[in-house]
């Protein structure tokens, strides 16, 4: 199951907040989605949020690998998680998420192929090479209210739902959209 939303482009004032929000929400075993939906409720095999960001557009999505019987219970729980006001996240969660993000950036600098990809992407998107320190400074500047701006923008955008397998237990797109406030 995939819930897809309009994202932001790399020039957006909430680009970095969107990246941090996605990481906090659904990147790794400590993420909110993994803990609530997989560990606590056992509704999925895998769950994560991510995004793709370009110079003129972007997408934000949540992926859930689940069975057709579990999808009926999954949708309301997933929507509840997406509806949580990011201002209620703790400062500790934000700090840990930023640290996780920064470790990934710095680890990537140790790989020649990752560094080449990063430099090429930076040059293509920004017409200049950007240092990891520049990126880290932008991540460090993100605050909880910025995460809420990103979350609100995501949920107010158009929703696309994609599913593989039996869909008799899957709600309509309109029904899912109504659950997202």
Regions found by a protein language model. Give the residues of each.
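Short, conserved charged micro-motifs
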Residues: 12-14, 70-73, 169-173
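His/Glu-based metal-binding/catalytic segments typifying zinc-dependent metallopeptidases
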Residues: 1-32
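M16/insulysin-pitrilysin zinc metalloprotease superfamily fold
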Residues: 48, 52-111, 177-181
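M16/MPP (pitrilysin/insulinase) zinc-metallopeptidase core fold and M16-derived inactive scaffolds
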Residues: 27-43, 54
């Amino acid at each position: 199951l995939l819930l897809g939303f309009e994202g932001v482009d790399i020039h957006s004032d909430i680009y970095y907040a969107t990246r941090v929000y996605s990481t906090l929400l659904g990147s790794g075993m400590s993420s909110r989605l993994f803990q609530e939906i997989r560990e606590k409720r056992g509704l999925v095999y895998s769950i994560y949020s991510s995004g793709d960001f370009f110079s003129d557009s972007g997408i934000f999505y949540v992926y859930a690998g689940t069975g057709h019987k579990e999808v009926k219970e999954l949708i309301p729980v997933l929507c509840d998680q997406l509806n949580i006001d990011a201002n209620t996240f703790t400062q500790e969660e934000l700090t840990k998420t930023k640290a996780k993000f920064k470790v990934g950036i710095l680890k990537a600098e140790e790989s020649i192929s990752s560094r080449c990809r990063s430099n090429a992407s930076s040059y293509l998107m920004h017409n200049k090479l950007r240092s990891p320190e520049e990126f880290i400074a932008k991540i460090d500047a993100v605050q909880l209210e910025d995460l809420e701006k990103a979350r609100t923008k995501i949920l107010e955008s158009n929703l696309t739902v994609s599913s593989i397998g039996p869909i008799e237990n899957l709600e309509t797109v309109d029904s899912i959209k109504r659950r997202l406030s």
